[in-house]
Amino acid sequence: MSKDDEGSLVRSLFNLLSGTFFSRLTGMLREIVMATYFGADPLVASFWLAFRTIFFLRKLLGGPILGLAFIPHFEFLRAQNISRAAFFFRSFSKFFCYSAIVFTLVIELGLGVWCSCVTGSLFDTLLLTIILLPSGIFLMMYTVNSTLLHCEKKFLSVGLAPSVVNVLWIGTVFLARNYNPRNRIFGLAIVLVIGFILEWAVTLPGVIKFLGRSTETPKERDSIRALIAPLSLGLLSMGIFQLNLLCDMWLARYINEVGPLYLMYSVRIQQLPVHLFGLGVFTVLLPAISRCVQDNEHQQGYDLLRFSLKLTVAVMLVMTMGLLLLALPGVRVLYEHGVFPTTAVHAIVEVLRGYSGSIIPMALAPLVSALFYARRNYKVPMLVGIAAAVANIVLNVIGCLVFKHVSVLAYATSLASWGQLVILWYCAGKSLPTYKGLMWRTFRESGKTVFTTVLAAFITVGINVFTNTTYIVFIHPLTTPIKPLTSLLDQCGVFFAESALFLAILFGLAKVLKAEDLMNLTSFQYWKGHQSILRN
C-alpha cells in the first residue's frame, strides 16, 4: 500500500468524486425527466414513498454501517497477512448475502398479507414496495463489495456504478412517457430491479482481482464475530436513523398527500453536496486514518483530519449559501417543465431552504466519527446518532402538529444535525485528547471564509434589489418579471447568470480579503494533490 498523505488523500478523493459526480449528475437528470413526464401526483408520491422504504429496509441490514465496521478490522488483518484479510472478506460477504435473501423473503411475505387487506394509495405503495424489495439484496452486495474496493483505493468504479441504474431509469421514463400512468410507474419499478443487479455487477471485477491475489488458505482464520458487537450498535443506530427518514415521509404524507414528493425532491438536492463531497472525503479519510492508527502515526492522522475539516468547511459554506440563494432558480431548472406544477416548485424550495442548515453538520459529523471508527470504537458515534435521530423524530412530530407545513420537517432535521455534531465532537475531545480543540480551531480559522461567503450573498441579493430582479431568488418578489420564466432556456439563463454573479463576487472578495481557503478551491493543482499547494 502507498503511504497516506495529503497528496494521496486528495488524489483518491478526486477519483471518487469523478465517479460520484457522474452518478449524481445522472441522478439529477432522472429527477428532471421524472418531473417533466410523470409530474407531481399521489401515484408518483406513492412511488417515492416505496422507493424510500426499500432503502430503509436495506439499511436495516447494515448499509453504510458495514463499511464503518469492516474497513478498520480489514486493514488490521491485512497489515498482518493478506490471506487472513481475504478469508475474512469472503466470510463477511457470504454472511450478508444469505441474511439479505432471508430478510427479503420474510418481508415480502408480510407485505403480501398486508397488501391483501388495503386499497387506494396505500395499496399502490405496498405493491410498489413488493416489486422493488428484491433489489435490496443487490444493493446490499454492492455495499459489501464497495467496502473492499475502498480499501483497495478503487474509488472510481464504486462511484460510477449507480449511474447504471440512473441511465436505465431515464431511458424507461422517456420511453414510457405516453403510457398509462399506472402501468408506467409499475413498469419503472421492475426495470429498477434489473438496474440494481447491474450496479452490483460493476463492482465484481475489482473484487475478483483482489481475491485472486490470495489463493492460499490462512493458518489463522478470523470470524466475523469480532464485528457482531459494533455492527449491532450500528444496526440499531442506522435503524433509528432510517426510521427517522421514513417518519419524515409519512408525516409529509399526513400534511399533504403529495408531501413525500416535495420532501424527496428537496432531499435529493440537499444530499448532492453532502454525498458528493462530504461523504466523499469521509470515504477516503477512513481507510487513511485507520492505517495511521494501526501504524501509530498520530501526527500524520492529526494533519490529515485537520486538512479534511478545513477543506470540507470551506466547500460546504459555499454550498450552503449557494443553496439558500439559488434554491428557486435551481428548482425551476430541474423540475418546472412539462406537467410539473409551479405550486410544487415553490413547496420544494421552501423545504430545501429548511434543509440548507444541515449541510455543514452532516458533512462534518462523519469526519469526526472517523476518529472513533479508526480505533474500532463504534459505541460513541452510534449512541450519539441514536440520540440525534430520536430528537429529530420528536421535533418532527411536534412541528407537524403545530405548524402543519412540510418545510418544518426540514428545519427540524437541520437543528438535530447541529446538535449531533456538537455532542460528537465533545465526546471526541474527552476520549481523544490529541485531537481536542481541532474542530474549534477549524471554525476559528474559517472565520474569514464565513464572513466572505455571507458578504458575497448579501451583495448578490442587493444587486437583485437594485436591478429589480428579485423574482429570481424570492418566491414572493418585490417586482414581477417582464416575462414568465417558463422555457428551459430562460430558466437556465437566469440560474447560470445568478450563479456566475454570486461566484464572481465571492472569489473576488476572497482575493481582496485574502480568504486562503476559498482561493485554494480555484486552484487546479490543489485538487490534483500537489504538495506545495496543499501546504500553503
Curated annotation (Swiss-Prot):
GO biological process: cell wall organization; peptidoglycan biosynthetic process; regulation of cell shape
Transmembrane segments: 31-51, 54-74, 95-115, 122-142, 155-175, 185-205, 226-246, 269-289, 311-331, 354-374, 383-403, 408-428, 455-475, 493-513
Mode of membrane association: Multi-pass membrane protein
Keywords from the UniProt entry: Cell inner membrane, Cell membrane, Cell shape, Cell wall biogenesis/degradation, Membrane, Peptidoglycan synthesis, Transmembrane, Transmembrane helix, Transport
Subcellular localization: Cell inner membrane
Pfam family, one: MurJ
InterPro entries documented for this protein: Membrane_Transporter-Flippase, MurJ
Pathway: Cell wall biogenesis; peptidoglycan biosynthesis
Cellular-component GO terms for this entry: plasma membrane
Domain of life, source organism: Bacteria
Its job: Involved in peptidoglycan biosynthesis. Transports lipid-linked peptidoglycan precursors from the inner to the outer leaflet of the cytoplasmic membrane.
Family of this protein: Belongs to the MurJ/MviN family.
Name assigned to this protein: Probable lipid II flippase MurJ
Originating organism: Chlamydia muridarum (strain MoPn / Nigg)
